[in-house]
Regions:
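Amphipathic alpha-helical segments used for helix-helix packing
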Residues: 94-118, 164-168
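Amphipathic alpha-helical packing segments from all-alpha helical-bundle domains
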Residues: 70, 112-153, 180-183
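Hydrophobic/aromatic-rich alpha-helical bundle segments in the mid-to-C-terminal region
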Residues: 138-185, 196-200
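Helix-turn-helix
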Residues: 10, 18-52, 56
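Hydrophobic alpha-helical connector segments
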Residues: 56, 70-96
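N-terminal intrinsically disordered/low-complexity leader segments
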Residues: 1-6, 194-200
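Alpha-helical DNA-contacting segments of helix-turn-helix folds
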Residues: 47, 53-61, 103, 123
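Generic hydrophobic, amphipathic alpha-helix propensity
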Residues: 7-15, 32, 57-68
């Protein structure tokens, strides 16, 4: 790893640690660089400000989770494969509540924002388009790309809402009790989008 990449990653990891302790709003650039054991000026070689760092952090987290989830999916049936993909993400987020909170507050932006090639999502300019490239066979050819992206984003936002509900202290169901309901909804969405498209 080059010194430049190492410093950039070191700053990112330091920020993640401090954000989790103090919250992003109460964290200063100086706090981050003290944790990273780097000079204050080094920060501005890689990030324009704290918000720029936070945005890149959210994209890094999202792409890492998505890439790792995709590696675990081996089912031949496209719907069951997608459910396996969602299941991996749920388990990860439930085990990492801070990352769940960070991503849930930025879910729509994270899915749709344009990304650069260095995020590792080959042949896609957003996280959502990367997912569509992997799961395009869930849809009929008559669906437009915009329709496909909307449906995928809908299922992922429902997933995120489910995770947030599960970690509430007064949640009436555990995540293991919620999963079958969520997966049934996903199956219904993808089993029915091919039948009389958008019929009311």
């Amino acid at each position: 790893m080059s010194d430049e990449i190492n410093k950039k990653e070191k700053i990112m990891q330091a920020a993640l640690k401090i954000f989790e302790k103090k919250g992003a709003e109460k964290t200063s650039v100086r706090d981050i660089m003290t944790e990273a054991n780097l000079g204050l000026g080094t920060f501005y070689l890689y990030y324009s400000d704290k918000n720029d760092l936070k945005e890149k952090m959210v994209l890094n987290l999202a792409t890492d989770i998505i890439l790792n989830a995709e590696k675990t999916c081996i089912q031949e049936d496209p719907i069951e494969r997608y459910i396996s993909f969602v299941d991996f993400i749920i388990d990860y987020l439930i085990s990492h509540p801070f990352e769940l909170d960070l991503l849930s507050k930025n879910i729509t932006w994270t899915l749709y924002t344009k990304i650069e090639n260095d995020y590792g999502l080959s042949e896609a300019d957003s996280t959502l388009k990367f997912i569509l490239n992997k799961y395009d066979n869930l849809f009929l050819t008559s669906h437009t790309e915009s329709e496909k992206l909307y449906i995928l984003s809908l299922t992922l936002e429902i997933m995120m809402s489910t995770c947030k509900s599960a970690v509430l202290e007064d949640s009436i169901l555990t995540i293991d009790e919620m999963k079958p309901v969520l997966f049934a909804i996903i199956r219904k969405i993808f089993n029915r989008i091919g039948e009389n498209k958008w019929k009311r």
